Regions:
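N-terminal secretory signal peptides and thylakoid transit peptides that target proteins
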Residues: 1-16
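Conserved binding/catalytic microenvironments
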Residues: 30-301
Length: 301
């Protein structure tokens, strides 16, 4: 998919949700189309691709609107359809939490992630329970991150690939605590889980779980041994899909910081300039934060 073709993405969105009167809340369960969970999952995957290409602010409003509509339908639905809509709503809530984080709205992020966890419990959705724990670990301080990641790993009936994501967050918590041996054990566990036949991660899922493990491994070594991380980041930047424009900017910022920390200041400036050009387009708060850190390191050098 062309990462700059907004019209194509929006047209695909129209196809993902056919002409359904979704702006009006249903008054009875019989009014709800049983295919809605599938349609909303398709739309979620599409909006995730739009976020990858254009950044969080391009989709945040649409995601919040759809979340309200999904909740209205879920409140009226009954039985298996209600449970399916709860699962869909939990996925949309987790994605909305990510968007809030990447827009710099940490308070909104917390509330949305708690909503995802609540819905996952109510719908008996172990993969989302584990995945939301991985997100909690990603955004917490190291000791709390380790507890959240380990709780995710212990989630009964969660798939191997989802638990692999919990293992990567445990590895990163160990890295922030300076424990290289535990990092290696956690990454080895993640590699083992990724190699296991497993259902995919909850939507939206890129299907590139192995690459996600490599990305977190690189971040671990950036904290412990920046010179080692540089080559890992280079490989990731080469292998990431070109449609992941926001991630390209973020990982250029990561490699720039690793270069600065390793004393390769000229390359740090060059990679930072590339990252800045992308961040100005995607308006990713995550990339902006990394670039501010880079600026402080370069100014002090």
């Amino acid at each position: 998919m062309d990462p700059i073709n907004r019209r194509g993405l929006l047209g695909a969105g129209a196809a993902a949700l056919p002409a359904l009167a979704l702006n009006v809340a249903p008054s009875a369960a019989r009014e709800i189309d049983p295919e809605l969970p599938e349609h909303w999952t398709a739309l979620l995957n599409l909006l995730s691709k739009h976020d990858d290409a254009f950044g969080p602010r391009a989709v945040q409003g649409a995601v919040r609107h759809e979340l309200r509509v999904i909740a209205e339908h879920r409140a009226v639905a009954r039985g298996e359809l209600c449970e399916a809509l709860m699962r869909v709503e939990s996925c949309w809530s987790e994605f909305s939490a990510w968007l809030a984080h990447d827009c710099g709205d940490h308070g909104g992020r917390q509330g949305l992630l708690e909503r995802a966890l609540h819905l996952a419990r109510a719908a008996d959705y172990p993969d989302m329970l584990a995945w939301a724990r991985a997100r909690q670990a990603q955004w917490a301080d190291a000791p709390m991150a380790l507890r959240a990641a380990e709780a995710g790993l212990r989630t009964p009936r969660a798939s191997a690939h989802t638990r692999a994501m919990c293992a990567t967050r445990a590895a990163y918590a160990h890295a922030r605590l300076g424990d290289a041996a535990s990092v290696e054990r956690s990454i080895a566990e993640a590699d083992h889980l990724v190699a296991t036949e497993s259902p995919p991660l909850p939507p939206p899922d890129s299907g590139m779980t192995g690459l996600l493990v490599r990305r977190w491994e690189a971040r671990c070594w950036a904290a412990l041994n920046p010179a080692r991380a540089i080559g890992m980041y280079d490989d990731i930047l080469r292998d990431q899909p070109r449609t992941w424009v926001r991630e390209q900017g973020l990982y250029l910022a990561y490699v720039a910081n690793a270069c600065a920390d390793a004393g390769e200041l000229d390359r740090a400036r060059a990679e930072g300039a590339k990252a800045l050009a992308i961040a100005r387009t995607t308006k990713s708060a995550t990339a902006t934060r990394e670039l501010k850190r880079l600026g402080a390191v370069l100014q002090a050098a």
